[in-house]
Curated annotation (Swiss-Prot):
InterPro entries: Lgt. Coiled coil: none annotated. This is Phosphatidylglycerol--prolipoprotein diacylglyceryl transferase. Catalyzes the transfer of the diacylglyceryl group from phosphatidylglycerol to the sulfhydryl group of the N-terminal cysteine of a prolipoprotein, the first step in the formation of mature lipoproteins. Its EC number is 2.5.1.145. It comes from Listeria innocua serovar 6a (strain ATCC BAA-680 / CLIP 11262). Keywords: Cell membrane, Membrane, Transferase, Transmembrane, Transmembrane helix. Belongs to the Lgt family.
Length: 277
């Protein structure tokens, strides 16, 4: 690479012709950490830990598939002429919002089958989801993707970033905004916020909805900085969806408080569908 800057090797392990990329290692690590956190939270909420494990067994593959389908739909102009590329997710091209949609649908169906409260289940996994997203963005970093517009080395140095991040943002002869880092840090902060508000007098389901609001708010602004956004006409898909999710989540919080009177978060411990008070 020009300018004497070398990117980090995206391959973590090479055994003969088989290579394991850092992207996969980081995503797998994010899943494991999310599982451990969810199990810990389930224990505090008096929920059977096997429920969390069973949910993830279904949610992980479905989320990966839905994330890929979401991406392919909005990049169909490319994939319609390259059908073989659709299954090659190691080439990149999965969308977090697609994964979130798949995970929520899986949890809704799963909670009905297991006869437990969807909202309680969603609250338990909310902190895990946002920290997993924070970790997962470093997979994008290793692949030199999900970056922002072109910038200068001086600007990156002005952010007091470590040298390895600055060098990794040097792509095809230019430096780029590390939007992956902005989102990762936003999610870490969101994780801390969720841990704080779960100790307040929020209602069942509101921890998850707070996660959706927090993530969507940050994603709306960060998405505007990216150069690889999925587009719907003249609109960035993730920005449109972010606004819709913020409005929907706030609306659900208000509606459920007024019409359903859900139990307080820390009182909903039985793992069964919460009844109205």
């Amino acid at each position: 690479m020009g300018n004497g800057v070398q990117p980090l090797d995206p391959v973590a392990i090479q055994i003969g012709s088989i290579s394991v990329k850092w992207y996969g290692v980081i995503i797998a690590s994010a899943v494991v950490i999310a599982l451990l956190l969810a199990l810990s939270e389930a224990n505090k909420r008096k929920m059977d830990k096997e429920i969390i494990v069973d949910l993830l067994i279904w949610a992980i593959p479905i989320s990966i598939i839905s994330a890929r389908i979401y991406y392919v739909i909005f990049e169909w102009d490319f994939y319609k002429n390259n059908l073989g590329e659709i299954v090659k997710i190691w080439h990149g091209g999965i969308a977090i919002y697609g994964a979130l949609i798949g995970a929520v649908l899986t949890a809704v169906i799963f909670s009905r089958i297991k006869k437990i409260s969807f909202w309680k289940l969603a609250d338990v996994v909310a902190p895990s989801l946002i920290i997993a997203q924070a970790i997962g963005r470093w997979g994008n970093f290793m692949n030199q993707e999900a970056h922002g517009a072109e910038t200068t080395r001086a600007f990156l140095e002005g952010l007091h970033l470590p040298e390895f991040i600055i060098n990794q943002m040097y792509i095809d002869g230019a430096y780029y905004q590390p939007t992956f880092l902005y989102e990762s840090l936003w999610n870490v902060l969101g994780f801390i916020v969720l841990l704080i508000i779960r100790r307040t007098k929020i209602r069942s389901g509101e921890l998850f909805l707070s996660y959706v609001i927090w993530y969507s708010f940050g994603r709306f602004f960060i998405e505007g900085m990216r150069t690889d956004s999925l587009m719907w006409g003249d609109f960035r898909v993730s920005q449109v969806l972010s606004l819709l999710l913020i409005v929907l989540s706030i609306g659900l919080i208000i509606y459920r408080r007024v019409k359903m009177n859900p139990p307080y978060y820390m009182e909903d411990k039985l793992g069964k569908v919460a009844k109205k008070k």
